[in-house]
Amino acid sequence: MGDLRSQPLLRAVLGGLLAGLAPGVAGPLSMLPALALLWSLVERPRDAALWGLFGVLLSHRWLLGLHPLTWMGLPAWLSLPVAVAIWLSCGVAAALLLLLWSLLARLCRRRDGTWRFGAVLLLALVWGAAELLLEGSPLFWIGVGGSVLPLDRPLAGLGRWLGSGGLATLQLLWGWGLWQLWRRRGRRCAWWLISLLLAHAMGALSLSPPPALAALRLGAWQPAIPTREKFSPERQRRFQSALSSALQQAQSLKVEALVAPEGTLPFRWQADEDPLPVPLISGGFRWVRGQQRSSVLLARPDRAGVEPLVDKHRLVPLGEWLPPLPAGLTRGLSAVGGLQPGDASRFVNVWPSPFAVAICYEISDGRALAKATAQGAEWLLTIANLDPYPQLLQRQFLALAQLRAIETGRDVLSVANTGPTALVSADGTVQRLLEPQTDAVAAAELQRRQQLTGYSRLVWAWSSR
């Protein structure tokens, strides 16, 4: 096979596969070698694109869990091709981005083919900035910055100052350094190791959480309802009794409110019990001027009906948001018939205390949550429905929740239909409240905090310009 350094195609495939293993699994242990291989291909746009293709196809392989889609009205013969097409489209999008980045790299090199460190730094900064911009778009889930967790919490501590974009930039620089060491057969590796150790030491020191104001005890309901069965007549009949049971369990746990996951309450839901045993904070659906929205709703014992707190802003393409296509072409693409986005702000300034909300996919938008924290959010809530996807997506989701906790210095309560239901402390430590796929109610005691992190201040200063 020869020396790996002389095999660009092999390096592209191997690097992409290593990168794909990083999010939620191997972290920097596989990402840094993957980035070193990418730097070795930086002047080969097609090979760099191949790196991106394989990286995203492997890291996003959970998308194949969409199949079968027959419950959404799609013919059985078309279900697998549609799931594969969605999966491949994500890989192709990543390949195009890597192609553009490689073309930019060609413009940055010297005429003699060598590299200034300033050019390397510029390319790393462009990558980090691109991840920050993309995380607010509907076409991004997890990148190099988010791949640090759950494996390397000390390094992720730097996210308290730099955010996910800064973590991505640092890893790009270390990847370049690792490639230089490889080229030189390991000579002059001291500076590389020292920078790595210093970053980990600084990150570990930064993990100290802001001081807590008071504790908040909340219940978390994980109903574990398979999405493919959720809208069946039998499940609809059983829903109200299941919710009533969860509310009674929450009352026995002496919590201030019960939190239920994304999409739990149907449109125009009314409680059977009057009054409710405890307040209910739940995902659900509502209509606003003829537009359907996925929302977080609050039902209180002393008030009739439900109060909308925040609407989902960042919608999943096709799964939630549908383009204006003829009705026959949208069949089988969305279980909810197409949603409209709400306001971009994630800040909720109501009972029980000011907090910020990320509904499912929105957990990848760190800037929005940092901005909400700067507006006064004292804790973060994320609700989701990750069924029917496999456990890999839950691990990636929880890794992003850890990163958001570290960036903002806030405790994060995650409540999901089939998991992960967990409490993430402001220092990124995770307390699993319930096992995946388990129908149960658990209590979580989180801490309310007000002191801002450097990253939240930076995001607020930038957004206020």
UniProtKB/Swiss-Prot annotation:
Pathway assignment: Protein modification; lipoprotein biosynthesis (N-acyl transfer)
Main location: membrane
SUPFAM superfamilies the UniProt entry points to: Carbon-nitrogen hydrolase (SSF56317)
Alphabetical keyword list: Acyltransferase, Cell inner membrane, Cell membrane, Membrane, Transferase, Transmembrane, Transmembrane helix
UniProt domain CN hydrolase: residue ranges: 221-448
Cited Pfam families: CN_hydrolase (PF00795)
Subcellular localization(s) per the UniProt record: Cell inner membrane
Membrane topology of the entry: Multi-pass membrane protein
PROSITE patterns in UniProt: CN_HYDROLASE
Gene Ontology CC entries for this record: plasma membrane
Coiled-coil boundaries: none
Record Gene3D superfamilies: Carbon-nitrogen hydrolase (3.60.110.10)
E.C. numbers: 2.3.1.269
Job description of the protein: Catalyzes the phospholipid dependent N-acylation of the N-terminal cysteine of apolipoprotein, the last step in lipoprotein maturation.
Protein name as annotated: Apolipoprotein N-acyltransferase
